[in-house]
A protein has these predicted regions:
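Interdomain helical connector at the RecA1-RecA2 junction of SF1/SF2 helicase-like NTPases
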Residues: 90-213, 229-245
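Conserved C-terminal RecA-like helicase domain
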Residues: 174-333
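A short beta-strand element within the Helicase C-terminal
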Residues: 333-336, 340-365, 380-384
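Conserved segment of the helicase C-terminal RecA-like domain
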Residues: 369-398
Length: 403
């Protein structure tokens, strides 16, 4: 990259690179300046360089941009994004650094919103369902216990506290729910039984002639939760007659069949950055997960080539290449934390299952994995499993902001 930037033959040339590679080149140049007093990019100081940044709402922080501008002071910046950061969802303050996309890149030159894309039939609309795994009585009891030990309500009678709970808006009630409540095995089992209930799975994975034709993503709050879901699904489906056993009271409707013995084919994918916390333990478990993956698909990936493993998952999920269009080569459900939720294009993804909190840009980006047009696909299907009233509000807020 450094040679390309400094080459005399590269005038009026477009160079495509990554933020990481550019930053690495600049760090190397800085070390040369400190050690040898050599200005490696001195010849570029007066040149007009244009930077075009894709996914600019997240690809380059304001701090990183300022550092790059120190090397290229005569630069012009353009940003492309489907989800700019606005005042409503601006980033946390960090000195005088920009907190919105407007602050970082300047005035917008053009807009093409979700509404425009829908009007042009370039994308599909969303059908959103908000599932609740916590019964209302349990939630009210949980809130009651919290208020009863709060000094602010020490003078309230039992009836007084109950009356106050009855008058609480649903979103306010959900503020009393700790994340740990959704990390219980009971919650995981309820989610899985909602996902794989035969009538539901038939629609969400678009079964035809007993086989799934579309894929889904399950996004969770952490790598630990992702792996717990993986193991729970493996345990639930290890018996060939698991559907009949688990859903004896939810028979599939007449005319609908689920006859694929390997359904659901599942995988976990994550970025190395996501895996930095508790890395040793995470990698130990991932070795076993990758071993299972290799055994099924006949691959030979390892923890040392995690990027190639992730790439293989991408291909099997997207089903764009001929070798992955053959039935049985695909993945039905991929479990992620953040990976694949931005910029990944796979029209065969029909459903996003959400077991975490999402809002604004992250919500729209994640939902948009499902809205690519594809034969016999009419909507992007979204199912959320945490704080249904809060998520309903988040969806409304994000849709209003980005439409």
């Amino acid at each position: 990259l450094s040679r390309a930037l400094l080459s005399d033959t590269n005038n009026n040339t477009v160079i495509i690179t990554t933020r990481q590679k550019l930053e690495s080149a600049l760090r190397h140049a800085q070390k040369q300046k400190e050690k040898r007093n050599v200005e490696r990019f001195k010849k570029l100081l007066g040149q007009h360089i244009v930077f075009v940044v894709d996914e600019c709402h997240r690809a380059l922080s304001a701090e990183n941009m300022d550092e790059i501008k120190q090397f290229f002071p005569n630069s012009t910046w353009f940003g492309f994004t489907g989800t700019p950061i606005f005042e409503e969802n601006k980033k946390q303050a960090k000195g005088q650094l920009a907190r919105t996309t407007h602050d970082q890149y300047g005035e917008k030159l053009h807009t093409y919103t979700i509404k425009d894309a829908l009007d042009d039939a370039a994308v599909l609309g969303f059908q959103v369902e908000h599932e609740d795994t916590i019964e209302q009585t349990s939630l009210n009891n949980h809130i009651f216990k919290n208020l009863q030990v709060n000094e602010k309500y020490a003078s309230y009678s039992v009836d007084g506290i109950n009356d106050m709970i009855d008058q609480m808006p649903p979103v306010e009630k959900e503020e009393y729910l700790d994340a740990t409540i959704y990390e219980r095995d009971e919650h995981i089992q309820k989610v899985l039984h909602k996902i794989f209930r035969p009538d539901n799975a038939y629609m969400k994975f678009d079964f035809q002639n007993g086989r799934p034709r579309k894929s889904a993503i399950l996004t969770t709050s952490s790598i630990d939760m992702a792996k717990r879901y993986y193991h729970a699904i493996k345990e639930m489906t290890k018996d060939p007659s698991w559907i009949q056993r688990e859903f004896a009271h939810h028979p599939i409707r007449t005319g609908r069949t689920i006859e694929d013995p390997d359904f659901p084919r599942i995988a976990i994918t994550y970025s190395m950055q996501e895996n930095e916390v508790d890395s040793a333990q995470n990698q130990k478990e991932m070795k076993k997960i990758i071993k299972d993956y290799n055994a099924y698909y006949g691959t030979a990936w390892g923890i040392d080539d995690i990027d190639r493993y992730n790439g293989d998952i991408n291909n099997r999920l997207a089903r764009k290449k001929g070798e992955f269009k053959e039935f049985g080569k695909q993945i039905d459900l991929v479990i992620v934390v953040d990976r694949l939720l931005t910029g990944f294009d796979a029209p065969t993804i029909q459903t996003l299952f959400v077991d975490r909190n999402l809002s604004y840009a992250n919500l729209i980006q994640a939902f948009s994995r499902t809205n690519r047009t594809y034969p016999d696909k009419t909507k992007g299907l979204i199912v959320t499993f945490r704080k249904p009233h809060s998520m309903e509000k988040n969806v409304a807020d994000a849709t209003r902001l980005y439409s």
